[in-house]
Amino acid sequence: MIKFTHLVHHHHDEHHHNEEHAHNATELTICLTMQERTKSRLKVMLSDGSEAGLFLPRGTVLKEHDIVESDDGVQAMITAAEETVSTVYSDDLLLLAKACYHLGNRHVPLQVEAGWCRYLHDHVLDDMVQRLGLNVKVEQAKYQPEPGAYGGSSAGSHDGHHH
């Protein structure tokens, strides 16, 4: 079993002389949920169907396109799994900012982008956001909350959350 022991950050500015290295790095992928990307020890399935293990330094949080490497040089790229999320889209940026404030005040790990925010689906939070006057779209999408929101939080307390 391959043991991935360290993280090699993905660079978006690959040049032609790095093409072979980049190709080798992306041959294998590991698709993980946000919760799985916060674990430093985890049994995973590689894109070729084989099992591997993550043995990363404690506190490592993986992001999409990060590359992990084994001691013998095998690399795999992390991809974000689609998850059931609630996404709030709005052109009213003040209202959207208020929703982000209220969600953050409840320590909800939150992905914040231009014109929208996203959190793991929770009907209680959806109701709160709708009471603010915003629409919530429940969808399957990749989820990458702002850094720091999930260190030791109570992210495992979602009633009715199934895998």
Curated annotation (Swiss-Prot):
CDD domains: UreE. Its main location: cytoplasm. Keywords: Chaperone, Cytoplasm, Nickel, Nickel insertion. GO terms for cellular component: cytoplasm. Residues 144-163 are annotated as: Disordered. It holds the Pfam family UreE_C. It is found in: Cytoplasm. The keyword Zinc-finger does not apply. One of its GO terms (biological process) is urea metabolic process. InterPro entries: UreE, UreE_C_dom, UreE_N, UreE_N_sf. One of its GO terms (molecular function) is unfolded protein binding. Signal peptide: none annotated. Involved in urease metallocenter assembly. Binds nickel. Probably functions as a nickel donor during metallocenter assembly. Belongs to the UreE family. This is Urease accessory protein UreE. The lineage of its organism: Bacteria, Pseudomonadati, Pseudomonadota, Gammaproteobacteria, Vibrionales.
